[in-house]
Amino acid sequence: MKLLTSLVFCSLLLGVCHGGFFSFIGEAFQGAGDMWRAYTDMKEAGWKDGDKYFHARGNYDAAQRGPGGVWAAEKISDARESFQEFFGRGHEDTMADQEANRHGRSGKDPNYYRPPGLPAKY
C-alpha cells in the first residue's frame, strides 16, 4: 500500500512540475469529469462494440485539459483495466482497451474507433 501511495504521489508531483499546482489539480478534476461523462455515455448508448470509442473519447477529452487531465485519464484508465483484468476479463480485450486509451490521450481522433451507426449525440 505504501508503494502504491508513493507511486501516485510521485506521479502527481511530476505532473505538477509542468505548471502550477492549482492548475494541475483543476485539470485533473476536469479530466476525471470527462472520463465520467464518456463512461455514462457508453452505458446510456449501450452500443455493441462501442466501448473502444468511448475509451478513446474520454481520454481525448481529458487530455485536452492539459497535463493534469492526461494524468487523471492515465490513472483512471489503468485502474479500470487492472480491475477488470483481475476479475476475469480477457487480456486481449484489456490490451485493446489500453490501445484506445493511449490513442485518445495522444490527441488522435477518437472517431477512429467510432462504431458504424452510433447516434451523432455521442
From Swiss-Prot:
Region described as Disordered: spans on this chain: 89-122
Pfam families reported for this sequence: SAA
Basic and acidic residues bias locations: 89-108
Gene Ontology biological process terms in this record: acute-phase response; response to stilbenoid
Localization per record: Secreted
GO CC annotations on file: high-density lipoprotein particle
Predominant location category: secreted
Keywords: Acute phase, Amyloid, HDL, Secreted, Signal
InterPro entries xrefs: Serum_amyloid_A, Synovial_Prolif_Regulator
Tissue specificity annotation: Expressed by the liver; secreted in plasma.
Record's signal peptide: 1-19
Function comment: Major acute phase reactant.
Family, per entry: Belongs to the SAA family.
Subunit structure: Apolipoprotein of the HDL complex.
Protein name, entry field: Serum amyloid A-2 protein
Organism name: Mus musculus
